[in-house]
Amino acid sequence: MDTQPIVLVITDSVTLHAAIVSWGLQNFQVKAEDLHVITQADRLEGKLNLKSSSLDAVVSISALHTQQWLLELARVLRPGGIIVLQNPNSVNDDVKETLSALERILLLAGFVLSEGADGSIDGLGPLAVKGRKPAWDTGSSFKLKKKVAQKPANVVTFDIPAFKVQLGDDLDDLIDEDSLLTEEDLKKPDLPPVDDCEVGKAGRKACKNCTCGRVEMEEKQEKLGLPSDLLDNPQSSCGSCGLGDAFRCSTCPYKGLPPFKLGEKISLSQSFLTADI
């Protein structure tokens, strides 16, 4: 019956120092027939002729650990198996940098970092890093525990008193809105008369039954003796005609009119158009 190795020590070198083999036997507490050694691993092209999950531990001694190589080591390791990476070219000056690089590549390959390896190997210096393959494997499954539904605790309820509003009792207290209006409020406002006189060729002209006040305005214009163009576009040679009678001369054509702005139509108020008694 073909038995698979339990511990594997693999290196790129042609030979392996006997101290490394002794360290592996002592550290992993295995028999000599259970520890296998592979040299010149760089010729394997990243593939091991081993079954998946067949090793308990792997010690890899190489100056260059690639991501592909670590994934292959992870394949042959059992869940929970130990992996030790060693860079034989490391010196005391760059130990920290080497450790950091090896730890990083271990994590990227899916391993979990473990405590640092103790002791040293003759001729190679201290072991670099020690990791462990997670205790689960691809395709593994486990049952999820369902939470038992708990009975709801006793809920204390309170009866909220309800208040009913009797609308019929307050109807007598309502105030009539019309009673708040006075006689002055009820009177219709005096709206300004609408100019509805006929429009002829010379402009608007008071009709026979004029109610808008145009008759009175025309009578006032005739009384003042001013043509319509002077009322529509008042002008002044002295500049004081629009200021009022106090500033007008005795011959001013606008004498008797209220103050106005030059160039703007003179608007006569209703009180001004009322005929003098």
From Swiss-Prot:
Region (Fe-S binding site A): 197-212
Location of the region described as Fe-S binding site B in the Swiss-Prot/TrEMBL record: 238-252
InterPro entries in the record: Anamorsin, Anamorsin_N_metazoan, CIAPIN1, SAM-dependent_MTases_sf
Places the protein is found: Cytoplasm; Mitochondrion intermembrane space
Region listing for N-terminal SAM-like domain, in residue ranges: 1-141
Chain segments carrying region Linker: 141-186
Cellular component GO terms held in the UniProt record: mitochondrial intermembrane space
Binding site for [2Fe-2S] cluster: C197, C207, C210, C212
The keyword Iron-sulfur appears for this protein: yes
Chief localization: cytoplasm
Keyword Acetylation: no
GO MF annotation, one: 4 iron, 4 sulfur cluster binding
Cofactor(s) required for function per UniProt: [2Fe-2S] cluster; [4Fe-4S] cluster
Functional summary from the UniProt entry: Component of the cytosolic iron-sulfur (Fe-S) protein assembly (CIA) machinery. Required for the maturation of extramitochondrial Fe-S proteins. Part of an electron transfer chain functioning in an early step of cytosolic Fe-S biogenesis, facilitating the de novo assembly of a [4Fe-4S] cluster on the cytosolic Fe-S scaffold complex. Electrons are transferred from NADPH via a FAD- and FMN-containing diflavin oxidoreductase.
Name of the protein: Anamorsin homolog 2
Species, as recorded: Picea sitchensis
